[in-house]
Amino acid sequence: MGEEREATRTEYKLEMDSELRFEIENKNEKVTVTLMNGHAELFGTELVMRKPYEFGVGAKVAIFTYHGCTIELRGKPDVAYVARETPMVQYLNSNSALEHLRAKAEQDDTQGPVVMIVGPMDVGKTTLCRIFLNYAVRLGRRPIYVDLDVGQGGIAIPGTIGALLVERPAPVAEGFSQQAPLVYHFGHTSPSDNDVFYGVLISKLAETTLERLEANKKAKYSGMIINTCGWVKGGGYRHILHAIKAFEVNAVFVLDQERLYNELLRDVERAVQIVFLPKSGGVVERTKSQRAEARDNRVREYFYGSKMPLYPHSFDVKFSDVKIFKVGSPALPDSCLPLGMKREDNYTKLVAVQPGPQLLHHILAVSFAESTDDNVIQSNVAGFICVTNVSMEKEVLTILSPQPRPLPQTILLVSDFQFMDSH
């Protein structure tokens, strides 16, 4: 132990309106950040002086200072540099405009701004949402965060959309507190896998969150910040237009793509403000395998936690104790459809799934619906389980669950997403 060398220390002096960016790709590397003097923030969350913050593999970090500061890095990031060109001041100005609208809403007892962030993949949409949310709660607001990105599933897990009342800034190295989120099961990681069902869920989530805004004065004045996925052409663009109407959006921030900005100016009602913002130079493009790894990590965190470990439960569930469904059945030619049924109905149909080996490693959503007489596809979910073993002989599924037995409800919805539990 005595021969173990102390981690490399590097000190960075940042000038006003600059940021320190670093990335960690090495699985065995940990980098610790400490603010030595001055003021700095990470995506809108303030760093506490002399408190060490630890980051691991996959971290892509940008620590910004408005007034100048000194930061110490311990460890060896793959990339680390200071950038003086950053859009943070523009992001802050945009936030000031939103805060002005919130103050006016409070004064007039009307609804605060409902804001949507759009743009192609890898332009920093989730980061900008986080910045806006953190700034809002630092000013005493309580905005609702809505995530329509089924690819990464920032509020629950991939294959879902959801909403969350944000009451405190996100911890520096983690996401927002996940207490009592409203989550809907989609079951795929791309909206194009079931276009019709995705549209139905957007409408349902919009209806529910707008009701919640009305019921909570503080949230009503604070408004919403809506994150979207990076599919911005064709069907993806139609979903953006649908979401703008469904959520009664009054401001859209377009990151990086002028074509999308101009299309929205052309197609959206004039009452909706369309604002173009540049992406940060620190945004990193992710490969397909990096996206898949990020999805896996998200599910692993759901069951096992991140900084604070969680201890999930493993137990058996009898086939006869649960009802398993998937949403959507293969499309039939029009001539084969039952009388009065439309082709679209196939995509939102509840299809019974027989328990069997095909469910191994699949994520199942536990629906709040109590029976199939309820509108199951539009019911929110209590949480998720993973099938770790199937015994046809005993007719039981072995599942990984965040809670001990029994399951809170018996209707389970199959996700395309698979998670290989390596614990």
UniProtKB/Swiss-Prot annotation:
Family membership: Belongs to the Clp1 family. Clp1 subfamily.
PANTHER family the UniProt entry points to: CLEAVAGE/POLYADENYLATION FACTOR IA SUBUNIT CLP1P, POLYRIBONUCLEOTIDE 5'-HYDROXYL-KINASE CLP1
Sites where the protein binds ATP: E19, K60, D122, V123, G124, K125, T126, T127
Gene3D superfamilies from the UniProt entry: Clp1, DNA binding domain (2.60.120.1030), P-loop containing nucleotide triphosphate hydrolases (3.40.50.300), Pre-mRNA cleavage complex subunit Clp1, C-terminal domain (2.40.30.330)
Key word Protein transport present: no
Official protein name in the record: Protein CLP1 homolog
One BP annotation, GO: mRNA 3'-end processing
Domain of life: Eukaryota
InterPro entries to which the protein is assigned, alphabetical: Clp1, Clp1/Grc3, Clp1_C, Clp1_C_sf, Clp1_N, Clp1_N_sf, CLP1_P, P-loop_NTPase
GO molecular-function term, one example from the UniProt record: ATP binding
Function: Required for endonucleolytic cleavage during polyadenylation-dependent pre-mRNA 3'-end formation.
Transmembrane segments: none
SUPFAM superfamilies assigned to the protein according to its UniProt record, in alphabetical order: P-loop containing nucleoside triphosphate hydrolases
Any one of the GO CC terms: mRNA cleavage factor complex
